[in-house]
Amino acid sequence: MSAFQRLCLFWLVYMAALGIFFPFYGLYLGTHAGLSAIEVGAVLSMLPLVGLAAQPFWGHLADRTGARSHVLAAVTICAGAAQLLLGHAYGFVPLLVATALLALFHTSVMPMALSVSLAVLQHDGRHAFGIARS
């Protein structure tokens, strides 16, 4: 499988996972997890708040080591594992902590994937970035 095909597959799986999970996460927290509206807001606020620190950390690590694709793979796997933990978190505090853990990894996947994609496509100029992401 070529690098371009791997990129297309990554973006397909990643965007499908985002589209399946995030539109319903807030609904799940409010209806099935039994959180109040304020608690749902607090849990969902973990994503951007933790992302403020996590994105620069993972980006710096990837740039410093020069192993962007390896860091991207590790962060993506950890984000998937953290997402699985959400199914075992019951109550406000466990869901808050589990969502913060998810955010620690998940919020860095998109920026790193964009960086890796553009670096790969730079060497193979025949493919447009939009095609890889679609």
Feature names for model-found ranges:
Residues 70-84:
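Structural signature of the two symmetry-related core transmembrane helices
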Residues 18, 48-55, 106:
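Residue-level signal for conserved functional micro-sites within the alpha-helical transmembrane segments
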Residues 2-4, 87-99:
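Helix-loop junctions at membrane interfaces in 12-TM secondary transporters
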Residues 53-67:
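Helix-to-loop junctions at the C-terminal end of transmembrane segments
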Residues 1-48:
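Helix-loop boundary and gating motifs at the non-cytosolic
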Residues 34, 66, 88-90:
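Helix-breaking motifs and short loop linkers at transmembrane-helix boundaries and internal kinks
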Residues 100-133:
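Cytoplasmic helix-loop-helix junction between adjacent transmembrane helices
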Residues 16, 20, 88, 92, ...:
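Hydrophobic transmembrane alpha-helices of Major Facilitator Superfamily
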